[in-house]
Amino acid sequence: MKIALPVFQKFNRLISSCKMSGVFPYNPPVNRQMRELDRSFFITKIPMCAVKFPEPKNISVFSKNFKNCILRVPRIPHVVKLNSSKPKDELTSVQNKKLKTADGNNTPVTKGVLLHESIHSVEDAYGKLPEDALAFLKENSAEIVPHEYVLDYDFWKAEEILRAVLPEQFLEEVPTGFTITGHIAHLNLRTEFKPFDSLIGQVILDKNNKIECVVDKVSSIATQFRTFPMKVIAGKSDSLVVEQKESNCTFKFDFSKVYWNSRLHTEHERLVKQYFQPGQVVCDVFAGVGPFAVPAGKKDVIVLANDLNPESYKYLKENIALNKVAKTVKSFNMDGADFIRQSPQLLQQWIQDEEGGKITIPLPLKKRHRSQQHNDQQPPQPRTKELIIPSHISHYVMNLPDSAISFLGNFRGIFAAHTKGATDTIQMPWVHVHCFEKYPPGDQVTEDELHARVHARIIAALKVTADDLPLNAVSLHLVRKVAPTKPMYCASFQLPANV
């Protein structure tokens, strides 16, 4: 026991040192004066030791039986190739990981097992490895050799690189968050990070293969069309026209000229799935490039889609054609207030334009069995289905959260005008109006209080009372929190008949 005790203690010390801590042991070199990205600065050579076995099968045996003796660091494989036709200086972390059986000259590649990161030399290995591990190596004629492992810029994550180059006072909140729209990454850098925008943008561009361009929002949304001034901080700037996939649809648009928010995809999907039914008529008052209208049209919902922004209207038409929903979606370029007031008339005009008030929609051809293809002389006949356009509108979508509630007054009287005052004979439409309900930081506001505030704004805009539209008749869905004290809601309710 007196002989075994030091060995046991030594083995325990190694096990203890091998346990993975939450801190990654290999951080990139630091240069807080860097303003233009220098990738070569991050090449780091780490002295290690590897075990080389004459019999390759012993690699797995040693790795399994002596787990606490081998390198166990995330993102670094413990099995590496030990010989290469390239000089060590040219090795990169990517090449370290390519474990092929032969190099470019068909020379067999010898693989080895990297020892624990605390072992930096052959002398370290003989001093730190437990005796049973050393005995196994000796029995199998293994050789402990020095090995230089090379890490480079590609090895580290974006946050790790940025933490190595940004000033220390910014390390608590390294700006790595962004939204992706098509091939564009969109950042909203705070003022203190603006001097480092090109550095931040280039790192994000490098670390995300699908991104070709990184933009930063220069100021808050202030234009009439909810677009914002932006700066290209990395990547190509010749075209900001993107293609974005959402709800099994493809949307094409110029990201700098229209409003698009990728974070709203679940809200687009929610309304289309939960409320809009095939054959119903939906008016999308602030349609943008069609994230509500186009998926609804694919579902055989009949949509009147409107947007005031000429660029949005241009791409709305293009997306209608691109997604083959021209039969069920009509586009308009009007002010939202005018569109609401004229919507019953626009629907009646559509009905008149279609023969018999019906829309004929082509269906995909039925796939024929191979035997039918040989036997039938006639090609498959085109198939169609018909949708009767209803004479009433079932839903209005108003996704303009800054000001949509202020447009509600335009509903007053429009149905009476088209039904000769007999509004009790028609089914009043549902309105889905998006809004913000901001409150001061520090205020303790309950969800019920916020709901009551939104309800009060709605009935005030409609010029009705709480008896006409009770709070419990309004469904309030929290879409997202734009900021901790700025929730965005979608209020859904059926218009009161006395509107």
From Swiss-Prot:
Its EC number is 2.1.1.228. One of its GO terms (cellular component) is nucleus. Monomer. It is found in: Mitochondrion matrix; Nucleus; Cytoplasm. Keywords: Cytoplasm, Methyltransferase, Mitochondrion, Nucleus, S-adenosyl-L-methionine, Transferase, Transit peptide, tRNA processing. The gene is TRM5. Belongs to the class I-like SAM-binding methyltransferase superfamily. TRM5/TYW2 family. Specifically methylates the N1 position of guanosine-37 in various cytoplasmic and mitochondrial tRNAs. Methylation is not dependent on the nature of the nucleoside 5' of the target nucleoside. This is the first step in the biosynthesis of wybutosine (yW), a modified base adjacent to the anticodon of tRNAs and required for accurate decoding. Postspliced cytoplasmic tRNAs are imported into the nucleus, where this first step seems to take place, after which they are reexported to the cytoplasm, where the yW sythesis is completed by cytoplasmic enzymes. Pfam families: TRM5-TYW2_MTfase, TYW2_N_2. S-adenosyl-L-methionine binds at H268, D307, L308, D335, G336, N399. Residues 1-44 form a transit peptide. It comes from Saccharomyces cerevisiae (strain ATCC 204508 / S288c). GO terms for molecular function: tRNA (guanine(37)-N1)-methyltransferase activity; tRNA methyltransferase activity. Present with 4120 molecules/cell in log phase SD medium. This is tRNA (guanine(37)-N(1))-methyltransferase.
